[in-house]
């Protein structure tokens, strides 16, 4: 039985590597539950600020991360390859299956419950509260919670990096989304048509802020991924922008 499980795990890794999903690091152990309903409608919004995950391009392969993984929002947009740990609970795993999810939300601690009985997202547990359609790709519904093997992998996105202009008056709150490569952002700077480069501070989730009164100016961005790649995206936001508008660049991260 143990040989069969090890063989199945090896087969999954081999197939994933051949399909371009080869992970960069070793497997880690964690657990996973699900939320949001069969259509994942309950996963919209979230602590990363992506809003409607359907229109934002993230779909239903998403998850809320426990605080140890969420890292106060710095992990927003990262991708994780997850498979059920068949060596631990073969009866609750879909044999040979794996899924890649995007971190879009926080699964907060529940201090009223012990971490091994309901407080699944309590530190220091690495836990994924996955959108139900994603979870069902690797687990059997009746189980409710399963042990998993996971690791961070490269993100693949359709189209370029997106910038959504939030805020009001002299306060700009820029949502940076649809990030490929490492998936998450280390730093952002903005340059208006009549300004130099201005460093933005991360406010919450994937939202970056400045107080520079940039309305009426075309905007360029310098974005550095957590993978260490920096892109200069010039004039991606035209001078006629207004709050609430989203603009898609023609550039994308590779790492």
Swiss-Prot record:
Expressed in panicles and flowers. Coiled coil: none annotated. Residues 45-160 form the Expansin-like EG45 domain. Residues 1-26 form the signal peptide. SUPFAM superfamilies: Barwin-like endoglucanases, PHL pollen allergen. It is a peripheral membrane protein. Its main location: secreted. It comes from the Eukaryota. The keyword Cell wall biogenesis/degradation applies. It is found in: Secreted, Cell wall; Membrane. Residues 170-249 form the Expansin-like CBD domain. GO terms for cellular component: extracellular region; membrane. Belongs to the expansin family. Expansin A subfamily. May cause loosening and extension of plant cell walls by disrupting non-covalent bonding between cellulose microfibrils and matrix glucans. No enzymatic activity has been found. May be required for rapid internodal elongation in deepwater rice during submergence. This is Expansin-A25. It comes from Oryza sativa subsp. japonica (Rice). The lineage of its organism: Eukaryota, Viridiplantae, Streptophyta, Embryophyta, Tracheophyta.
